């Protein structure tokens, strides 16, 4: 009685362990496959310029950084759990006819099919919405290649007849080739992603530009009431209830921005910038790039007040 109880408990523990490995490998596989696809998509967006700057077809550094983060975490988890699964299949600890193996493998096939369908729908939708044909073709090939490779591998795996004690070269080839491809995608992403230091400097500049926007709005309101430009920033601060003293200075150095009246409706705001937004291709930076184009260093940005038509940026 004790023998059978022990055997049953060991089998139950193994089933729980293998279910855990399969589910964890599935989650890691989803993140790894999607993040690899996202990185390739962003590389395509970066390298192939489009005069129509659609959000879905434009380079997005935020999406790229998320994909890199997901790839770094999910890749080792997937290969570790997959190795545990196939090692137990090889030793016979996990039977090829196990319900856990069959159900979860077919579930992985189902998920990869859904992902492939979703990716293709998305790429076709962007193509119909005016995306470049070359971009559409490359993204479609990427989606089909990734989802097809996952589907093909697991479909082959579930159909294998001899598993225990037999080393399968197709399984081994898939693991090594997929790992090499993942590493190549990761290395490629490093050439187009900005460093954490560059990101921080750019975000500080964005704070500066947000403060320029606040000052700009206050100047416009002042001009609407007084029909003239304010003499200095202190005048604007005293006039506006929505503009704090902190917004008149650099967020890092606390150095006060310079303000100069150039003509009846023209003025400039000056400050120090850590980066240049003139060559930024990130879709999220388009507003500041159009509204407040600046280079690195001390820059004076000219603006024109127009109460009727709103604020317009002067061509530099």
PLM regions: where:
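Cytoplasmic membrane-interface regions of multi-pass membrane proteins
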Residues: 9-13, 82-100, 155-169
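Generic alpha-helical transmembrane segments
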Residues: 62-85, 142-151
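Membrane-embedded alpha-helical segments of integral membrane proteins
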Residues: 110-160
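Short, surface-exposed interaction loops/tails
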Residues: 194-196, 263-316
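Extracellular/periplasmic head regions of type IV pilus-like filament subunits
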Residues: 217-278
């Amino acid at each position: 009685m004790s023998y059978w109880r022990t055997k049953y408990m060991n089998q139950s523990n193994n089933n729980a362990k293998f279910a855990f490995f399969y589910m964890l490998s599935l989650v890691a596989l989803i993140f790894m496959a999607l993040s690899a696809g996202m990185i390739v998509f962003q590389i395509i967006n970066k390298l192939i310029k489009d005069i129509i700057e659609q959000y879905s077809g434009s380079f997005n550094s935020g999406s790229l950084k998320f994909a890199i983060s997901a790839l770094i975490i999910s890749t080792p988890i997937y290969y570790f759990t997959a190795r545990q699964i196939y090692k137990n299949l090889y030793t016979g600890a996990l039977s090829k006819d196990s319900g856990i193996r069959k159900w979860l493998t077919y579930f992985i096939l189902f998920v990869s099919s859904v992902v492939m369908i979703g990716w293709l729908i998305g790429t076709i939708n962007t193509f119909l919405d005016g995306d470049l044909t070359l971009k559409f073709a490359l993204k479609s090939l990427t989606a089909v290649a990734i989802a097809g490779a996952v589907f093909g591998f697991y479909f082959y795996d579930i159909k294998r007849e001899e598993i225990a004690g037999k080393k399968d070269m197709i399984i081994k080839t898939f693991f090594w080739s997929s790992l090499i491809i993942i590493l190549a995608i990761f290395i490629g992403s490093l050439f187009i992603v900005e460093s954490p230091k560059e990101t921080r400097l750019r975000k500080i500049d964005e704070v500066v530009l947000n403060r320029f926007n606040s000052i700009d709005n206050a100047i416009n309101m002042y001009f609407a009431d007084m029909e003239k430009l304010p003499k200095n920033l202190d005048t604007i601060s005293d006039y506006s209830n929505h503009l704090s003293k902190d917004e008149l200075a650099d967020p890092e150095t606390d150095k006060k921005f310079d303000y100069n009246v150039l003509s009846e409706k023209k003025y400039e705001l000056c400050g120090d910038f850590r980066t240049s937004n003139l060559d930024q291709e990130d879709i999220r930076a388009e507003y500041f790039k159009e509204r407040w184009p600046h280079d690195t260093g001390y820059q004076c940005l000219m603006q024109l007040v127009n109460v009727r038509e709103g604020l317009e940026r002067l061509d530099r």
